[in-house]
Regions:
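Generic cytosolic/nucleocytoplasmic N-terminal low-complexity/intrinsically disordered segments
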Residues: 1-3, 28, 32, 185, ...
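Catalytic-core signature of thiol
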Residues: 172-329
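Intrinsically disordered, low-complexity peptide-like regions
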Residues: 2-5, 60, 181, 261
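N-terminal Sec-pathway targeting helices
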Residues: 1-11, 21
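Hydrophobic membrane-targeting alpha-helices
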Residues: 14-22, 214
Length: 329
């Protein structure tokens, strides 16, 4: 009986040894180096990209975590990290403007760079460079090479694979991020000049044109001041005047904006059943008289609306600032 137990135990040990040795041999074969296995195979990038893109990537810029609601990086099929161009103003404090749906212009301070969708060329100032991953559209979002962006604006990249975090560290002084001068007309961001006439709709014109400048040059559109001033929830006449909180309420309630062609200005009539041309997701209210914040907002995002409070009772009055002959301040 004891001998049978002994042989049984010996058989188990022998089988265990064979299984272990076979596993060791299998592992050895996996890591055995050959000329063929030393080359990085394209399908490996695809597998890695699929795994990395399976959940959001955390982005940290100069030690500050980027709000994930702004968007997320992704990896292309050839192993390049890509960033939505719409994230650039908030994350890297640069203007990012899309012309004709395919030409991306990035600016910060005195730095000017251009890329074209599908093209490997990066134009940095007057110098042309080749980038590994051209800008590409994915699910309606334009992605640009993170490597190209960090090259343009002098950032160091560090990929923390364990925590799925990309860390960017800049070397430029934030005080140099704004240019010495900036002209919306030259940048193609200035909306067309409009005529308010004699109605008390200055607040609507200011809000609508600030919004128009926000979506330019990607979307050259004219929104309706008539709809904002007649179809808001305050039910004032167009001669009653208004102010910025009324336009904020109208836009954030998604009552508008509608297109100017659907509701032209000045006829006193606004048709029923018009749908918003876009949905405003966020409005920033800047600190009073913070002129640097105003400059930054104009450069990165679009025109700003300002409010003027006065003791004037009507437009028939004259003050230091208002001239009834011209109807202007």
């Amino acid at each position: 009986m004891k001998r049978n137990v002994f042989y049984g135990a010996l058989l188990v040990l022998l089988l265990g040894f064979l299984v272990r040795e076979n596993r060791l041999i299998h592992i050895t074969k996996q890591v055995e180096k050959t000329e063929e296995s030393a080359e990085w195979q394209p399908e490996w990038y695809e597998q890695m990209a699929e795994e990395i893109n399976d959940s959001p990537i955390t982005l940290e810029v100069d030690g500050t975590m980027v709000d994930p609601q702004l968007g997320s990086l992704r990896m292309s099929q050839d192993g390049q990290f890509m960033i939505p161009y719409g994230m650039l103003p908030d994350t890297l404090s640069c203007a990012a403007l899309l012309y004709d749906g395919n030409r991306l212009v990035m600016e910060r301070g005195n730095t000017h760079a251009e890329m074209t969708v599908g093209s490997p060329e990066l134009l940095l100032g007057e110098e042309s460079q080749t980038i590994a991953a051209p800008p590409e559209w994915e699910n309606g979002i334009l992605y640009v090479s993170l490597e190209a962006v960090t090259e343009v604006f002098s950032y160091e990249e560090n990929w923390d694979a364990e925590n799925r975090k990309m860390e960017l560290t800049g070397s430029e002084d934030p005080a140099t991020f704004l240019p010495e001068s900036y002209d919306y007309r030259k940048a193609g961001r200035a909306p067309a000049v409009k005529n308010q006439g004699s109605l008390g709709t200055c607040w609507a014109f200011a809000s609508v044109m600030a919004l128009e400048s926000r979506v330019r040059p990607e979307w050259n559109v004219s929104f309706s001041e008539d709809h904002m001033s007649l179809r808001n929830s305050f039910h004032f006449s167009q001669n009653a005047g208004g102010e910025y909180t009324m336009s904020m309420a109208y836009l954030l309630a998604w009552q508008g904006p509608v297109l100017e062609e659907e509701d032209p200005y000045g006829d006193g009539y606004s048709p029923d059943g018009l749908s918003p041309a876009c949905h405003v997701q966020e409005i920033q209210v800047l600190p009073e008289k913070d002129y640097e914040a105003v400059k930054r907002a104009v450069y990165l995002y679009g025109g700003v609306q300002s409010s003027l409070y006065t003791a004037m009772v009507s437009d028939r009055d004259n003050t230091h600032y208002y001239r009834k002959e011209t109807g202007a301040y």
